């Protein structure tokens, strides 16, 4: 009697006449085994390992009388028709109601997605004709401590065949599988998730607990503030700030008033804070190695007219090892102006302007905060890495490249799916709290994604001795190079043997990336010119991309099914780039949120037009965020900085090669001296 029937009978208060013991379910056995201590697990393993790991008895497929055929393709067609789902594991089963299903055979799809599984109908059981079902599986892996790979298979779908099939031939035909599909409605390379649907992956269990632990202390605070607002009793910004844990800048101001608003601190955070970005030389001071420029062109995008977001042009200078702002030029629209390219009035501020200089610095700081959230954080890390994650999941199965990349690509599509409505979109936090409209945000992200390419990327060199971010980035980049070189030395032969998967991976990347974007200013100043002020190492090759019609932003690794000269090195560079942004770069932008965006009056995503304009003091609350936006900002900054799960050195899922862990541990003291606790760097983007 089946377990199901025995339990139904028991639930009705009846007793089974059968004396046989209740059948243990696999999950029951797994829970029991997980509860044993190490000594007990070793004892059980000694007794069962030979049977658990024993391969199924193999039979010569040619001797099996029946065959099931078919072809697996992606749900969505490509330009030339159906796209093959290559190298997926497929299993053929006999469905049985109330008793365990019977395994009939297995195989793999070929390069065209076709499969043929030979089987014996008698394996369905005596007197039973098989009820055919096809099941598909994707590969998973873990690493043992010695670097050996352990492969497992995760079921991703199934296709029902006929009941009581008595023939010796069955063709499942072309089976369309909705697997890691691109969203045809998005100009970016984004994963398609239907309304009320879920992505084809899941968070590791520990991540949910870490999220709850981080957010629980502040969730009630935010909800209380929001309820007070709905009741018409919104708390003051000072009360909102005081209700949250003390932020870094608030503590510094308490201990040393004015310290975080100083020119020196402004420059230091541009070098080493979450605002850290590429520092170009000042093009108006050719040959001056001490002069720098940061330019943020916001007038190119649609704005809501309620917030003030001018073009920001900051000129900086190294003075005795410190980067100091010396001039800020703001291209101010008129209040209420919304159209891209609206007329602007340019105003210049210097330290001699007193309160106006402080207001200009605040505007520049807010602008840099929005830029890092849309650029360094959401664009260059989250959405940029997502396009590599989709292409990798669609194409890498037999190639060992999967073992190198997948640990750093897992979960990014999940957190990005949450961002679709939480941060961006018509009701997203960035849309509500900044000057950019939904269209403005989308266009900015499209332009940003059009400027990202793996080819030729290397972290920029430090501009001064105190440029800790750049030094840490270069050290991390070097260690990734050592890790990847060793991986290719170990697996290079098989990697090249499965190069056709690399070609398909590369094809998907290029096909679905946005067109390269080069703004009018750079198009006029850089391509074909020396332009020594322009930092090229972290930018795409403008000479190659500033042509008409514009090529795709992401460069191809290969165009053939076997590697050509230089292409293996190109693939190494791509891997290094992806892992760098999924780990170090994201950690730096994300983990410093509470440090640099934990005080509403210090920095936020948008200042409003007030009665006296937008360039006023912090005491003028007309320009500051509204209470509901303020509490949400602090909640988000805390959540991003304090959700701790998925660190490289913890390696909870054991999917990162132990070599990378060893390299980072060996250089932990060097990172610490640069202000980075390497234990806080995640292996992937999951927050």
Segments (PLM) and residue ranges:
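Structural signal for hydrophobic/aromatic residues that build the beta-strand cores
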Residues: 70, 90-92, 113-117, 134, ...
């Amino acid at each position: 009697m089946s377990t199901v029937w025995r339990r139904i009978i028991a639930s009705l208060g009846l007793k089974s006449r059968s004396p046989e013991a209740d059948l243990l379910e696999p999950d029951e056995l797994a829970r029991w085994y997980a509860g044993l201590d190490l000594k007990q697990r070793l004892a059980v393993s000694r007794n069962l390992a030979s049977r658990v790991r024993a391969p199924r008895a193999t039979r010569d497929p040619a001797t099996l009388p029946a065959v099931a055929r078919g072809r697996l393709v992606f749900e969505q067609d490509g330009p030339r028709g159906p796209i093959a789902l290559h190298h997926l594991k497929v299993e053929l089963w006999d469905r049985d109601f109330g008793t365990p299903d019977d395994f009939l055979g297995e195989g793999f799809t070929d390069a065209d997605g076709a499969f043929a599984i030979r089987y014996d109908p008698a394996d369905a059981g005596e007197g039973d004709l098989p009820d055919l079902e096809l099941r598909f599986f994707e590969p998973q892996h873990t690493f043992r401590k010695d670097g050996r790979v352990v492969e497992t298979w995760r079921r991703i779908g199934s296709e029902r065949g006929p009941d009581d099939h008595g023939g010796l031939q069955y063709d499942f035909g072309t089976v369309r599988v909705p697997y890691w599909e691109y969203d045809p409605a998005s100009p970016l390379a984004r994963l398609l998730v239907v309304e009320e649907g879920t992505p084809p992956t899941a968070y590791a269990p520990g991540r949910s607990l870490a999220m709850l632990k981080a957010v629980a202390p502040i969730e009630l605070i935010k909800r209380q503030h929001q309820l007070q607002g709905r009741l018409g009793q919104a708390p003051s910004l000072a009360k909102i700030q005081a209700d949250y844990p003390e932020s870094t800048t608030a503590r510094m101001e308490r201990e040393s008033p004015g310290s975080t608003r100083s020119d020196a601190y402004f420059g230091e955070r541009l070098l080493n804070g979450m605002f850290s970005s590429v520092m170009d030389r000042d093009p108006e001071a050719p040959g001056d190695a001490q002069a720098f420029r940061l330019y943020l062109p916001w007038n190119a995008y649609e704005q809501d007219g309620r917030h003030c977001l001018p073009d920001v042009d900051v000129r900086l200078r190294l003075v005795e090892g410190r980067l100091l702002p010396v001039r800020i030029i703001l291209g101010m629209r008129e209040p209420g102006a919304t159209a891209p390219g609206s007329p602007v009035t340019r105003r210049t501020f210097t330290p001699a302007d007193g309160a106006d200089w402080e207001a200009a610095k605040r505007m520049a700081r807010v602008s840099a905060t929005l830029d890092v959230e849309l650029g360094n954080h959401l664009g260059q890390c989250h959405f940029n890495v997502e396009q590599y994650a989709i292409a990798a999941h669609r194409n890498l199965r037999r190639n060992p490249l999967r073992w190198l990349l997948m640990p750093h690509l897992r979960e990014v599509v999940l957190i990005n799916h949450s961002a679709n409505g939480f941060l961006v979109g018509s009701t997203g936090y960035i849309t509500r709290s900044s000057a950019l409209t939904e269209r403005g945000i989308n266009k900015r992200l499209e332009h940003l994604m059009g400027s990202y390419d793996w080819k030729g990327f290397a972290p920029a060199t430090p501009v001064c001795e105190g440029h800790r971010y750049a030094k840490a980035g270069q050290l991390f980049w070097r260690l990734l190079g050592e890790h990847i070189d060793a991986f290719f030395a170990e697996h290079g032969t098989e990697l090249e043997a499965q190069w056709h998967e690399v070609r398909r991976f590369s094809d998907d990347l290029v096909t679905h990336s946005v067109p390269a974007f080069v703004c009018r200013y750079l198009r006029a100043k850089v391509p074909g010119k020396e332009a020594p002020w322009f930092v090229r190492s972290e930018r795409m090759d403008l000479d190659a991309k500033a042509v008409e019609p514009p090529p795709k932003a992401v460069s191809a690794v290969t165009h053939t099914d076997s590697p050509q000269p230089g292409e293996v090195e190109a693939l190494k560079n791509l891997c290094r780039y992806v892992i760098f942004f999924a780990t170090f770069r994201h950690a730096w932008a994300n983990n410093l949120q509470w440090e640099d965006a934990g005080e509403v009056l210090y920095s936020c995503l948008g200042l409003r037009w007030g009665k006296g304009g937008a360039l006023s003091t912090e005491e003028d609350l007309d320009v500051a965020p509204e209470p509901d936006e303020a509490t949400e900002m602090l909640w988000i900054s805390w959540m991003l900085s304090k959700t701790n799960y998925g660190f490289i050195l913890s390696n909870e899922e054991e999917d990162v090669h132990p070599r990378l862990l060893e390299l980072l541990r060996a250089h932990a003291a060097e990172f610490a001296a640069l202000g980075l606790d390497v234990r806080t760097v995640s292996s992937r983007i999951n927050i």
